[in-house]
Amino acid sequence: AGTLTLLMAELLAGLVISQTIKRGAQILLGMLPVYFDMRTMLNFYDPQSILISVACSEMMKHYAIPHCATSGSGTGWGMDLIAADTYWMNTLALLLSSGHLAPFIGDSLGSKSISPTTFVHCHEIIDQALRLHNGFQLDDANSAVDEIFKVGPGKSFLNQPSTLKNYKTGYYVSGVYPRYSMEKWMDAGQPPARQVLRQKTQNLMASALAPEEYDEFIAKGEEFIRQRFHDIL
């Protein structure tokens, strides 16, 4: 609670300073939900730090101030088991709060590294977490009480209107990880999930179209690297 109190004081002070400099300036207030370990000199995500971020989001909602936080940032060594649990915890907590903008997706190793596979896996997490966040409608139109009464016990709902309408979207289908039975997984060569993710990521990168300003953007980046690091390119 003390950390949250100090955080609110810092954020609101920043708001006052920004409006003093330029009245009406647009601003987002928020935090990176991390602790800093003085022994290792590293920051890291933690359930408590993410909880403080959620509380910060609720306070920004109370003040009617736009909020930003992270969703899918992790402390793993790339896209690994360490990162996966943090991505889920970070994303779901933000969606269950009053979170707004969520930059900083897919970083690892103290935000010094980004692996393309992290973006693809985070997309999976965000897609599923949004379904939890959106919930479902519990009303007469969606509860299908009339159909249940009409069909009666011991019969099939396969040809009922609600089934025909929703059977393609009634449950989540991953765009990355197939639902293998043990037999099909063995027939596929027993691939590790990380290998499947890597292949999907490579396919996406190979099929992605470069933006119109790609050549100009890359040229500027290479020129900056040459000036800073001389003959590295």
Features from the language model and the residues they span:
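Long, contiguous hydrophobic alpha-helical segments, chiefly transmembrane helices and signal peptides
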Residues: L12, H67-G72, W88, A93, ...
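Short acidic (Asp/Glu) and glycine-rich catalytic loops that position anionic groups and cofactors
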Residues: P33-F36, H67-S71, A102-K112, G175-M182, ...
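Catalytic-core signal marking the mid-to-C-terminal active-site face
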Residues: T117-L233
